[in-house]
Amino acid sequence: MKETFKGENRVSITPDSAETLVKAGFHVVVQSGAGANASFSDAAYVDKGAIVLPGDDFYANADIFAKIRPPSEEEVPKLAGKTLVGMISPSLNKELYEDLAEQNTNVFALDCVPRMLSRAQAYDVLSSQANIAGYRAMIEAAEAFPRFFAGQMTAAGKVPPAKVLVIGVGEFSSLR
């Protein structure tokens, strides 16, 4: 499902994940242009066995929808009687959640899956997205920093390595 939130460049289903679903026996329908902001063409999805359809045809031919951000007000009626999987944040979007419930939309709010060591850990989207955000933050910090992050020793002289303080916990804070 194409992301409609301004500035959202992620996509919930990549061509490779579409191929995995197709091999598992699912018919995968992708909304035309869904992967464009993430640099995935419609042709890449077709090459992996997915069917690419425009707007209304897409909604009419799919039963389960995957999305990163919560659906927009315009998308909600199109999901009536269907299933939505994604980061819905029901505690922050109570009205949206109630609207989806009123029209019998099944919702799997992946951001509500418990974050603990268990079988559910494979569905912990918050940790994976936080890891990506932390990695990107370091790349952007390195780009904004006026000199090299790593120390340099050249014939022209020596540049000491940057000292960086990472505030937080998790896997990314252990990267060097």
Residue ranges and their predicted role:
Residues 1-39, 146-176:
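Glycine-rich phosphate/diphosphate-binding loop of Rossmann-like nucleotide-binding domains
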Residues 3-5, 32-35, 57, 70-71, ...:
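Short, ordered loop/turn segments at secondary-structure junctions
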Residues 7, 62-69, 81-89:
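Extracellular/luminal Protease-associated
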Residues 23-27, 50-51, 64-67, 102-106, ...:
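Generic secondary-structure signature for well-ordered alpha-helical cores
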Residues 49-61:
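Short acidic low-complexity segments
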Residues 56, 64-67, 71-77:
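Glycine-rich phosphate/dinucleotide-binding loop and adjoining beta-alpha-beta core of small-molecule
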Residues 73-163:
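Glycine/serine-rich phosphate-binding loop and adjoining beta1-alpha1 elements at the start
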